[in-house]
């Protein structure tokens, strides 16, 4: 979603252009993964998705991850972030109080969708290992 929202010069697109880019991105293919919060468009994405992964990680883990990514080239950002963004760090710190309740409300509303809630890096790793094992098993069955 950051690729849709941000320009390379660190300016943002307006809401209309962002919504258009988002709609086009979701319409381009039958299978997609959209990463990010962008709460204003969360419900639109929930309406169209078939699976939800909610990474409900502790604030400190999120802050550490942001700090670790600083100075690295990322495919999800049109520039390399070299400095800590105080506004973004504040957003992360207040996420559990301000954004998480909205996500939980939408989880109730879209309860028919399968939700996977992962609350730690260990749970994320275990989930991915399970996917790898399942894919390996499926390949063996195809032979």
Where are these regions (language model features)?
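Glycine-rich phosphate-binding loop used to anchor ATP phosphates in small-molecule kinases
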Residues: 20-60, 96
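Short, hinge-like loop/turn segments at secondary-structure boundaries
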Residues: 15-20, 71-72, 134
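Short amphipathic alpha-helical segments
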Residues: 44-47, 64-67, 129
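Conserved beta-strand termini and adjacent loop/short-helix elements that scaffold enzyme active sites
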Residues: 1, 36, 118-120
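NTP-dependent small-molecule kinase module
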Residues: 94-143
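A glycine- and Lys/Arg-enriched "phosphate-lid" helix/loop adjacent to the NTP-binding pocket
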Residues: 57-99, 132, 142
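Conserved nucleotide-binding/hydrolysis micro-motifs of P-loop NTPases
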Residues: 4-5, 58-62, 123
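Conserved substrate/cofactor phosphate-moiety recognition/catalytic segment
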Residues: 1-31
């Amino acid at each position: 979603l950051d690729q849709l929202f941000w320009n390379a010069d660190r300016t943002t697109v307006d809401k209309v252009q962002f919504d258009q880019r988002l709609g086009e991105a979701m319409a381009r293919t039958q299978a997609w993964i959209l990463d990010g919060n962008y709460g204003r468009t969360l419900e639109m994405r929930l309406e169209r998705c078939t699976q939800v992964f909610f990474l409900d990680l502790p604030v400190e883990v999120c802050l550490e991850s942001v700090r670790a990514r600083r100075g690295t080239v990322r495919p999800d950002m049109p520039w390399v972030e070299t400095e800590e963004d105080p506004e973004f760090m504040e957003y992360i710190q207040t996420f559990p109080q301000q954004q998480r309740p909205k996500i939980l409300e939408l989880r109730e509303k879209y309860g028919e969708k399968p939700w996977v809630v992962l609350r730690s890096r260990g749970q994320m790793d275990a989930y991915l290992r399970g996917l790898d094992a399942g894919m390996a098993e499926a390949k063996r069955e195809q032979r």
